[in-house]
């Protein structure tokens, strides 16, 4: 604080002193809080001389915080969160034990209340939707529409719900309603994916299977950017609405939408019938709405911080990079060499080889 008063009271000659030759060459600058006498320090940094900028930056940061260089090539100020950050040393064994217990309890309840045809309501729900029309395409769209209304509706009510019952209770409510509906939609798609009218047949064309496999594999790196913290998903940790900025978010601000579109196009190309096309139409429409709704909710929650991130990111993949609004760090690849992405890689490969098991389990439900 003393440096502020020194800056205001010192003669001009003091401000013209050359910078210290030992000034560190660092790469990151943090947001500088406003000072009651100087106002917004970030505006002073942009309008003052280089020497004044150095004094202001040094006076508002702790000694252990880095200072940016004056080079125009310095990385952009990081406002949001570092996605996929996972520090093993900060993990608590008891939290993961709780996670295992919660997961087991949820799966047990889901099986009794929804999956098991002798006790659950899943089959009755599927039959009710299917009886609306004899068309599997219509049933597929109806299932997606019901899920979309519930899922996006509850997401829009998150702020109100968390104030009324708390973050953890609202997450349990959100998952408890969304999970059975999502599972019903997935199982129906697996069981009826080859119904309907065939539009094209490319499964015997050389190279198509490999291209579809790669597209599906890549899609999962986009699909789950906000579920890296599984402890929040299970409400072991207090759930938060995150403002991610690094990793996949540099490529697109809505990776889940992009991943879903890639997944839908790949599966529709491979299956090639009207049921797959209707499923893709419904899922893509839902995620396009989700992208708009997500921006609206983040803008409401984070205000100017979100608007700043919005200016240097894009919905269309790589658009902000090509336009120069997003500058990738030289070591950008390190934002992907992290345990959550390794876990996604393993789970995606495992899911591919587990396709026969998932199909067999779905067939046995007769949904």
From Swiss-Prot:
Q: What reaction is this protein's catalytic activity?
A: 9,9',15-tri-cis-zeta-carotene = 9,9'-di-cis-zeta-carotene
Q: What induces it?
A: Up-regulated by light.
Q: Which UniProt keywords apply?
A: Chloroplast, Isomerase, Membrane, Plastid, Transit peptide, Transmembrane, Transmembrane helix
Transmembrane parts of this sequence: 95-115, 137-157, 172-192, 211-231, 269-289, 339-359
Query: Which segment is the transit peptide?
Result: 1-58
At the top level of its lineage, which domain of life is listed? Eukaryota
Q: What is its EC number?
A: 5.2.1.12
- Tell me one Pfam family matched here: NnrU
According to its UniProt entry, the protein's GO biological process terms are:
carotene biosynthetic process
Q: Which GO terms describe its cellular component?
A: chloroplast; chloroplast membrane
Its membrane topology, per UniProt?
Multi-pass membrane protein
Q: Which GO terms describe its molecular function?
A: 9,15,9'-tri-cis-zeta-carotene isomerase activity
Task: Name the enzyme's class.
Answer: isomerase
Disulfide cross-links: none
Tissues/organs with expression: Expressed in leaves and at lower levels in roots.
* Cross-referenced InterPro entries: NnrU_dom
The knockout outcome noted for this protein's gene is: Lacks carotenoids in the dark and exhibits delayed greening when exposed to light.
Query: Where does the record place it?
Result: Plastid, Chloroplast membrane
> What does it do?
Isomerase involved in the biosynthesis of carotenoids. Catalyzes the cis- to trans-conversion of the 15-cis-bond in 9,15,9'-tri-cis-zeta-carotene.
Instruction: Note the PANTHER family from the entry.
Output: 15-CIS-ZETA-CAROTENE ISOMERASE, CHLOROPLASTIC (PTHR35988:SF2)
Give the protein's recorded name: 15-cis-zeta-carotene isomerase, chloroplastic
The protein's organism comes out as Arabidopsis thaliana
């Amino acid at each position: 604080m003393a440096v502020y008063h020194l800056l205001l009271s010192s003669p001009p000659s003091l401000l013209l002193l050359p910078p210290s030759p030992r000034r560190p060459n660092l790469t990151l600058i943090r947001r500088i809080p406003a000072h009651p006498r100087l106002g917004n320090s970030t505006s002073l940094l942009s309008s003052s001389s280089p020497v004044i900028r150095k004094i202001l930056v040094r006076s508002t940061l702790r000694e252990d915080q880095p200072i940016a260089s004056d080079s125009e090539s310095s990385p952009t100020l990081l406002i949001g969160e570092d996605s996929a950050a996972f520090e093993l040393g900060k993990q608590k064994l008891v939290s993961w034990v709780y996670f295992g217990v919660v997961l087991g309890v949820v799966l047990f309840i889901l099986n009794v209340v929804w999956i098991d045809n002798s006790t659950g309501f899943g089959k009755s729900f599927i039959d009710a939707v299917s009886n609306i029309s004899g068309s599997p395409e219509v049933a597929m769209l109806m299932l997606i529409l019901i899920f979309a209304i519930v899922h996006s509706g509850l997401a829009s009510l998150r702020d109100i719900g968390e104030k009324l019952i708390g973050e953890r209770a609202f997450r349990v409510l959100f998952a408890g309603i969304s999970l059975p509906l999502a599972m019903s939609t997935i199982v129906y798609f697996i069981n009826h994916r080859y119904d309907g009218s065939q539009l094209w047949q490319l499964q015997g064309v050389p190279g198509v299977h490999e291209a579809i496999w790669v597209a599906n594999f890549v899609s999962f790196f986009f699909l789950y950017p906000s579920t890296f913290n599984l402890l929040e998903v299970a409400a072991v940790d207090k759930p938060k609405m995150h403002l991610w900025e690094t990793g996949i978010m540099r490529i697109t601000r809505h990776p889940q939408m992009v991943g879903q579109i890639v997944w839908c196009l790949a599966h529709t190309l491979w299956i090639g019938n009207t049921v797959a096309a209707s499923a893709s139409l419904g899922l893509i429409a839902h995620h396009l709405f989700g992208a708009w709704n997500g921006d609206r909710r983040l803008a409401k929650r984070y205000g100017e911080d979100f608007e700043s991130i919005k200016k240097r990111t894009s919905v269309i993949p790589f658009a902000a990079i090509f336009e120069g609004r997003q500058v990738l760090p030289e070591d950008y690849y390190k934002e992907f060499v992290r345990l959550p992405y390794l876990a996604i890689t393993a789970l995606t490969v495992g899911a591919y080889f587990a396709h026969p098991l998932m199909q067999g389990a779905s067939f046995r439900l007769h949904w």
